[in-house]
Structure formats: structure tokens, C-alpha cells
Amino acid sequence: MIKVAVAGPRGKMGREAVKMIHEADTLELVAVVDSKHDGMLVRQLDGLPPSDAPVYNELERCLTSQTIDVLVDLTTPAHGKRHMEIALDHGVRPVVGTTGFTDEDITNLRKKAEEKGIGAIIAPNFAIGAILMMKFAQTAAKYLPDVEIIEMHHDRKLDAPSGTALKTAQLISEVRKAKQQGHPDETEELKGARGADFEGMSIHSVRLPGLVAHQEVLFGGVGQTLKIRHDSMNRESFMPGVKLSIETVMGIDTLVYGLENIIE
């Protein structure tokens, strides 16, 4: 059994993760970290499963009080990096679903993981379908280099563009030379109308109630277009990827950024 703690158990993703871990035959929920409800049990929190795992309001105290193999962090970009550093310092393997990590952050965290000889995973998106979308988009960009990305999320999402959109753009840029798209003399009547620029690609962010997580990668060529789209209808769609990450992180000794690097 892999012993797992969850940071951020009352968020929408956190609730699904706690439920999945509690029900999984190969995983054991041993604790959760929440800024409120210190000293309570998971089963005493609204909407969470009937688990006797304790609630801690501080990650460090949680890690020193329990035997934990993996920390699943589903908090915020501000907390994700700090929680990852604390977990690595305690020899606990972090699986982090928040975004906002810079290249320098990833380099430093990878160095720390390798010094400790343990695995770590940062996943901008846990939906396996979204990972396949990114892989398909990278392949398409070899032949259709004119591309724009449109990502759509619920209106409570704090960062824009999404980590998935940025990761998609990065993967495309590995096979596509930077090029300016659109008319060379085009103007914006409203600032930002053409989206954010990434090596000539435009990334557009939509935030509306009723959405969960959606992305289109739109390619254009002579006399044709190609659209690659993924939709997460609910947060259960992310749980197979969370479980895969927990199982995978136990067998690696470096930091992996992006589920596409652990899916064959």
C-alpha cells in the first residue's frame, strides 16, 4: 500500500482525490493538510469520505507525525512550490497539480529530488485525454505550423493562460520554428484582442461559469483547418492521471514535469 497525504482536500480537485485514494485498493489515505479543521478527522468534513485520517493545518507537522510515501498537492500556485520543497526536505515524494512553476523553479526542484534520490511529479493537467491532445498537437505542428490555442476554464481559476496551454505551446515549439502569424501590419482595436504571444502563436483564455477544463488547438493550412479538442466534463476525469502519478512517482528518482513524460 502506498501511504498518501493530500494538501487541499476541500477544493473541488482535492475532494475527488481524497475520494479516489480512499477507495483505491493499492493506496492508503493517511492524512490531509487543510488550513482549517486542525485535529479533526476526514470523515468529519463535509463532502469527504468516511476516513479516520487526521487533518493537520501545517504540512511540516503532518510529515513529521505520519509515515507518508507521497504528498498530493492540489492547493494554489503560491502554496504548491513551498509544499513541494518541504516534502522533498522530508524525503516524501510530491505529486503537484498546481501551475506557476518557472523553468528555474523546476531546475532547482529537480536538483533537490535527485540529491534526495526520490521522485517528484508536476502535472499541469492530470487528464490523460488532455495529454494525448498535446501529443497529437505536437505531431500536427510539424506539418501545419500556423496554430492558435484556445483554453477555456471555470471562472474561479486564478492563472491565465492555463498550464496546459503553456505546456502545449512549449511542445509545439519543439517541432515548429518561431514565426509571426497573421497580417504583418495587423492592429488591435482592443488591447489583447489577438491573445498572448508565444513564439508567434496566440493563446486565448476564456473564463466562464459552467466550464470545467477545455482546450482547442486550431491549425490552419492552405484550404484546410484542423481542430484538436479535449473537454473535461467533471473532475473525475483527472483521477486516473492522479492515481497513475502516485504509482509512478514511487519508482523514479528525479522530477518529471508533465504526464506526457510518463505515458508511453
From Swiss-Prot:
EC number: 1.17.1.8
UniProt pathway: Amino-acid biosynthesis; L-lysine biosynthesis via DAP pathway; (S)-tetrahydrodipicolinate from L-aspartate: step 4/4
Signal sequence, start to end: none
GO terms, molecular function: 4-hydroxy-tetrahydrodipicolinate reductase; NAD binding; NADP binding; oxidoreductase activity, acting on CH or CH2 groups, NAD or NADP as acceptor
Sorted UniProt keywords: Amino-acid biosynthesis, Cytoplasm, Diaminopimelate biosynthesis, Lysine biosynthesis, NAD, NADP, Oxidoreductase
Keyword Cytoplasm recorded: yes
BP GO terms, sorted: diaminopimelate biosynthetic process; lysine biosynthetic process via diaminopimelate
Primary role: Catalyzes the conversion of 4-hydroxy-tetrahydrodipicolinate (HTPA) to tetrahydrodipicolinate.
Name this polypeptide is given: 4-hydroxy-tetrahydrodipicolinate reductase
